Amino acid sequence: MPKFKQVKNLKIPGVEPPEKVCSDPNCPWHGTLRVRGVLLEGVVAKARARRMVVVQHVYLYYDKKYNRYERRSKKIHAHLPDCISVKEGDVVVIGETMPISKTVKFTVLGVKRR
């Protein structure tokens, strides 16, 4: 008989818990992984690896010399729990966690737009 996993309340506005249940220990909703630090929004650039996506985060940087803003972007590796399904081009919310591997320090919390 499978046990029912309790969904944690992350108290993040605009992010709903997923409907699927997973047994991933690195899931912020059903596992033991804590979300702390920054929350970012970005577009999924690559979703080819198993349980990992590359998210492109675009932000504005102020250039003091020219008194203008320039658009910069960075690619962030994020863990993808089994209970959340994404495709390339989806807008997702990611949260900072403890390091999961050498390059993965964020996890996907939810999908904003498909």
From Swiss-Prot:
One Gene Ontology biological process: translation
Intrachain disulfide bonds: none
Entry keyword rRNA-binding: yes
GO molecular function: rRNA binding; structural constituent of ribosome
Keyword tags: Ribonucleoprotein, Ribosomal protein, RNA-binding, rRNA-binding
One annotated Gene Ontology cellular component of this protein: cytosolic small ribosomal subunit
CDD domains in the cross-refs: Ribosomal_uS17 (cd00364)
PANTHER family xrefs: 40S RIBOSOMAL PROTEIN S11 FAMILY MEMBER, 40S RIBOSOMAL PROTEIN S11-RELATED
Similarity section: Belongs to the universal ribosomal protein uS17 family.
Assembly description: Part of the 30S ribosomal subunit.
Reported function: One of the primary rRNA binding proteins, it binds specifically to the 5'-end of 16S ribosomal RNA.
Name of the featured protein: Small ribosomal subunit protein uS17
Native species: Aeropyrum pernix (strain ATCC 700893 / DSM 11879 / JCM 9820 / NBRC 100138 / K1)
